[in-house]
UniProtKB/Swiss-Prot annotation:
Its main location: nucleus. One of its GO terms (biological process) is regulation of DNA-templated transcription. The keyword Zinc-finger applies. This is Nuclear hormone receptor family member nhr-4. The keyword Translocase does not apply. A zinc finger (NR C4-type) spans 50-70, 86-110. Residues 215-481 form the NR LBD domain. CDD domains: NR_DBD_HNF4A, NR_LBD. Orphan nuclear receptor.
Length: 492
């Protein structure tokens, strides 16, 4: 039995010997960047857990139990004096599955749990003395300097002090003190003090200019204003649209999308349960939504920035998704446990028109359970609805030109960030809750996608057997996704 009073497997002997050695101390702080190659277990058999991200830790690094990933991240950040910024309010969760998502919050967590930046510099100085292993090469003068790093107003500041006893080969003064409190904003005017290595300044995760910064809450107001203007764009005061329902529309989508008044007048929309939905009401409600959808698309700046060809591809692909979302939301707002249309007709789970009941037979259970119920559960409001609608509309880039894909991708990121910011400010107390809320909304959108496929099949079958006489425009719109653009063949 060894001096610990227990038997030690020879394979782990090096591990226990390493643990017996006192860590290198600097001003009383634990500075050992442990590289223990034994098992990551405590003396009582439990596994060491990284204090930063919760991953498995293999010993103490810079004063805390840390995994190799967080150890390396902290070392690189301190050595290079990197400065990060957070897009999401500065309190992102730091867990092992997503620890690389926000470097700003990860570095902040490193300091909060007690990682010692002095330990990083001591390791660097020792490596420099031993030939530069583990860090950039330094001169004897530079390696004899010690650093003290502090955090002030979100900036990393560094101070180097030269000890009174210096090597004879480099001594020119009795004592030398160097201060280099850098102002990152005015660094160009402040030259690097003598004896210091050039510093690498790196700003990471700064949102581009076309994306909202964390405190920009104007985006949801802008799209909400568009929604209200389009919704209440009602030059026709009297609802006489039912009289024209039986007139078939044979014009192609590309034509009527630019001239939606050819499909339906812009009569006032009232999503309510005033009468039982009939096949005529269904067709009329579909047409009123078509006009509303066209007006909304043409009011969006990102949509107007697309080429005419990309506009048609995107509009045709998203019209049914848009229809399910807005009909569900305005039905939820009206308190109807079913689906309401703009003409005041509604279909409920029970007691509907036989043809309509057959048409919605497959859709209604999913619609109520995975769309209407989540809206009630989340207490979704108008701002969230319009932002989710934008995310859904700009969620796909297939079939678009290269320029169109770039516009759609930027728009999606813009509205996704805006939805997070709105939820973080108005619905949730932590960033984790806001992220979870968005994830649940995305699940709801996947249910709407499923409903779209079911309805496309329903329109096809219903038209085939003449259960409901849909015109050519409706049938064409509910067919498969429009053809996608193929990249041009290489010349030669």
């Amino acid at each position: 039995m060894n001096e610990r009073g227990m038997l030690v497997d020879p394979r782990f002997d090096a591990f226990f010997k390493l643990e017996q050695i006192d860590d290198y101390k600097y001003d009383g702080a634990d500075t050992s960047p442990s590289t223990s190659n034994g098992l990551p277990e405590t003396s009582n058999g439990g596994r060491l857990i990284c204090d930063v991200c919760g991953d498995v830790a293999f010993g103490k690094h810079y004063g805390i139990n840390a995994c190799n990933g967080c150890k390396g991240f902290f070392r690189r950040s301190v050595w290079s004096r990197r400065q990060y910024s957070c897009r999401f309010g500065g309190d992102c969760p730091v867990v092992k599955e997503h620890r690389n998502v926000c470097r700003s919050c990860r570095l902040k967590k490193c300091f909060e749990v007690g990682m010692n930046p002095d330990s990083v510099q001591n390791e660097r100085d020792r490596n420099a003395k031993n030939g530069g292993m583990g860090g950039p090469m330094s001169s004897p003068t530079q390696s004899s300097l010690c650093k003290e790093l502090t955090i002030s107003n979100g900036q990393i500041k560094r101070k180097r002090l030269r000890p009174e006893t210096v090597e004879k080969t480099t001594q020119t003064d009795g004592k030398l003190e160097i201060n280099d409190d850098f102002d990152f904003e005015n660094m160009q005017q402040n030259p690097t003090p003598p004896g210091l290595l050039p510093l690498k300044i790196e700003r990471i995760s700064t949102p581009p200019s076309d994306l909202p910064v964390p405190m920009d809450f104007s985006i949801h107001s802008a799209v909400l204003d568009i929604e209200q203007k389009v919704f209440y764009n009602c030059p026709v005061a009297v609802d006489n649209s039912i009289n024209a329902t039986k007139t078939p529309i044979t014009l192609p989508f590309e034509v009527v999308f630019r001239q939606p008044h050819l499909v339906c007048n812009r009569y006032p929309m009232r999503f309510s349960n005033t009468r039982v939905l009939t096949p005529e009401d269904l067709i009329d409600g579909w047409r009123r939504h078509f006009t509303y959808y066209s007006d909304w698309c043409h009011a969006m700046d990102e949509f107007k920035a697309l080429s005419p060809e990309d506009q048609i591809v995107l509009a045709k692909k998203k019209i049914i998704l848009h229809g399910w979302l807005v009909h569900a939301y305005y039905s939820y707002k009206s308190g109807c446990n079913g689906i309401c249309f703009a003409n005041g007709a509604a279909h409920l789970p029970e007691g509907g028109h036989p043809s309509i009941t057959e048409f919605y037979k497959e859709c209604m259970p999913r619609y109520l359970n995975y769309v209407i119920y989540p809206m009630h559960n989340f207490q979704m409001d108008d701002a969230e609805m319009v932002l989710i609608k934008c995310i859904m509309f700009f969620s796909s880039e297939s079939g678009l030109s290269a320029a169109g894909r770039q516009i759609v991708s930027a728009a999606r990121e813009k509205y996704l960030s805006a939805l997070y910011n709105y939820g973080r400010a108005n619905k949730c107390t932590t960033s984790a809750q806001a992220t979870l809320r968005i994830a649940k909304f995305m699940i709801m959108l996947s249910a709407i996608t499923s409903l779209t496929h079911l309805m496309n099949e329903g329109v096809h079958v219903t038209s085939l057997f003449n259960i409901i006489e849909f015109d050519e425009l409706i049938q064409a719109t509910h067919k498969t996704t429009p053809p996608q653009h193929s990249p041009p063949a290489p010349m030669g």
